[in-house]
Amino acid sequence: MEIPRLLPARGTPQGAGGGGCPAGGGGVHRAPASLACQAPTRRLLLLRGAQDGGPGPRSAEAQRASRGLGPSLNRLAPRPDHRSSGGGRGGGAGGGGGGSGGGGGGGGGGGGGGGGGGSRGGSDDFFLLLLDPVGGDVETVGTEQAGAPVRREEAGAGPRPERRQSAGPPAGRPEPGPRCLSAVPAASPLPAAGPGPAAAAAAAAAAAFAGTITIHNQDLLLRFENGVLTLTTPPLPAWEPGVAPFPQPQPPPQPGALIAPQAAAAGFPPAAAAAAAAAAAGAQLGDCPELPPDLLLAEPAEPAACPAPPEEEAEAPAAAAAQSPRGPAGPGPGPGVVLYLCPEAQCGQTFAKKHQLKVHLLTHSSSQGQRPFKCPLSGCGWTFTTSYKLKRHLQSHDKLRPFGCPVQGCGKSFTTVYNLKAHMKGHEQENSFKCEVCEESFPTQAKLSTHQRSHFEPERPYQCAFSGCKKTFITVSALFSHNRAHFREQELFACSFPGCSKQYDKACRLKIHLRSHTGERPFLCDFDGCGWNFTSMSKLLRHKRKHEDDRRFTCPVEGCGKSFTRAEHLKGHSITHLGTKPFVCPVEGCCARFSARSSLYIHSKKHLQDVGAWKSRCPVPTCNKLFTSKHSMKTHMTKRHNLSQDLLAQLEAANSLTPSSELTSPGQSDLSGAELVSLFSDVPGHGSAAVLDTALVNSGILTIDVASVNSSLAGSLPADNNSNNHSLGQAAEPRALRGAPSDLPQSLDTSLFFGTSVAGYQHSPLDMDDVSAGNVGLFGSLALKNSSLEPQALTPSNKLTVDTEALTPSSTLCENSVSELLTPAKAEWNVHPESDFFGHEEETQFGFSHPTGSHGSQKDTDLITVTGTPFLV
């Protein structure tokens, strides 16, 4: 082993007589004053240990240097602050430091001291130069072999010829006090060379004391007896050296340096403290303070992972000493605190206990795959950094939940205390989620969100009274609709319209439903410029809220402020506050989601724009809807224009669903293709298929194929007929027609149809009894009379306009082909008193003259009315 340098006792003031100390030293250790003036003695101190065997190559050199027989070792220069008051060449070399192959020199007069050691050639050479605790010269000798006999003390009565000795205390040293005598207990006296004061002093100076020092992290027992220093390995350390802070910050210790802590360390006996003080420093004159407890050899400092900045010199010793497993020997943040620094780069964490540092180091090794604790169960590959985590993991295999919640009524248990603590926070923060609307509190955010939906949705004051049903509704009409589900077993009112199988629990509801088939909308909005009409009064009242700006349904969310006229609109708006998007685009490959149905509708139009070209247009003249397929157009006509399936089949067979490329304009819609045979049926008398389908009349869609007109329609068209100058589009009052039959012509010309004038028409009588009986097929529609007019398009109308000059009692129909759509005329009059279903409303009616006799006689004509309902409103 190697002891490079022996530091003097801390606290020796600079410039004091005798041995000095480095700057910032501690207390001064001095020998008894009564022994300082005696004749110098020679003590041979042997350092004994397990590594002291073998011949020391530097033993002779050290002995010669100590005795002054050889030259001084220049490389063992004394410390700059060491001074020796004794004479001789030995005093000049006292207090020197040892090197790899150096020796040591002794000081005279107890003023200097040093040690040295080295190794060369594989053999160890150790020697120790100690200041004489009782004064006089101290001689160092290298050990030669293990177990060598302890050399006896050599005492001389006078000074040696090689050195100058002083009979009294050196100049500048104060007289020592008597209280240091108790620090060195008396023991068996050493054998003296002769009687006299020197022998008595030697006997009094003999002392035996023991202590413990740590060299290279190994505790050694130090025993100083009869001038012999002995180091042995203890079987078991009886105590751990204490750590006390220094009175002031110190620089980092040098590698291998001996550190002398404060003498007032707890747990050290006074004798051991005195022995350590005597072994650590030379005896000096003056007062004797408390002695250090032991001598600690600091390890060579390793490079610190996070070196302290220069201004933090107070923390540098602790950071450097924390690299060792023992921890820092210097002061920490507070008195008696040991800090262990993590050696990993860029970590810098410190710990108060060594095992905490070990556990922390496992976290660094775990990132490199070093997890030593593995689950022993087969099939489980979990590994952990600590045994506690493995133990906690094994509880999960055993289904053990030892940590139960202490809250009454909870009953939950957990596998770890950490999970229990996390659960307890829920009880501590119970009802911490508060609703901003009603101030009600909830334990979790999920429950709060569920509660907030009740505020976003409108109130539902109407509850079902059926037994066992607790559903609530926003409006009373929704409640009535729901109640019908409970009365389905009762007698229901079924819709008799072909293709409709809806049933209702009340006749009034069926009546409202039938209006959707007939197109009747008796409830008209009376606001100027509106023109909307509805099938029920409730829908009309709901519509009037727009004109009155009655937005009774307001969003309850703070800061929103939106209001709506209908409850369902508010309900759809409330979804936007929930953050959900329930409306998904049905187009394949499109994952767009929306919170409102209206947003989805707007989005769906973007997909329709990708279609190359529109194929079909709605055949209703006032409807400009375009469709990509006939199926979508048929669906539109059924729902929007209330056309039956039979009528749609006829239109499809007549090829009336015309592509838009053939529709030049709404006013020139070519709806030809339907034969008269398919459009007119049940003609009495002559077998001519000329009875108009009433469904086509009611719908306002009339198509006539010019090429299919091959039947002889009796009638004549005089070339000089003055009625050609008039059109059928002029309105007339039917009451006036009924009151003045003489205004009506007695012959019905071919002004029912327009076309080329043909001479030589054959006349046939017209049986008006069939017309009065309800067969209005032949005159179900009135045509333009002027043949010079361009073809006109179908126009929606709910009134019939009758031109009195165009109505003639002619019973013959022309055989020429017609090439135009027939437009119903408009007329306004009150309905018959017996018509109670439609009420007072404007309806499509057709007026026909009803001659009671033959066409040749001048008789009064009666006007019959046929009620029709157009779907285009």
From Swiss-Prot:
UniProt-annotated location(s): Nucleus
Composition bias type Gly residues, residue spans: 14-23, 85-120
Superkingdom field: Eukaryota
PANTHER family reported for this sequence: ZINC FINGER PROTEIN, ZINC FINGER X-LINKED PROTEIN ZXDA
Functional summary from the UniProt entry: Cooperates with CIITA to promote transcription of MHC class I and MHC class II genes.
Region described as Required for transcriptional activation: 645-776
Keyword annotations from UniProtKB, A to Z: Activator, Metal-binding, Methylation, Nucleus, Repeat, Transcription, Transcription regulation, Zinc, Zinc-finger
Source organism: Mus musculus (Mouse)
ZnF (C2H2-type) intervals: 340-364, 373-397, 403-427, 433-455, 462-486, 493-517, 523-547, 553-577, 583-607, 616-641
Positions of region (Disordered): 1-23, 48-120, 138-184, 240-259, 301-330
InterPro entries: Zinc_finger_trans_reg, Znf_C2H2_sf, Znf_C2H2_type
Chief location bin: nucleus
Similarity section: Belongs to the ZXD family.
Region annotation Required for interaction with ZXDC: where it falls in the sequence: 340-646
Molecular-function GO terms, alphabetical: C2H2 zinc finger domain binding; transcription coactivator activity; zinc ion binding
Gene Ontology annotations of biological process type: positive regulation of DNA-templated transcription
GO cellular component, one term: nucleus
UniProt biased composition (Basic and acidic residues): 150-165
List of residues that carry Omega-N-methylarginine: R89
Record-given protein name: Zinc finger X-linked protein ZXDB
Pfam families, alphabetized: zf-C2H2
Quaternary structure note: Self-associates. Interacts with ZXDC and CIITA.
UniProt keyword Endoplasmic reticulum present: no
Compositional bias of kind Low complexity: 316-327
SMART domains membership: ZnF_C2H2
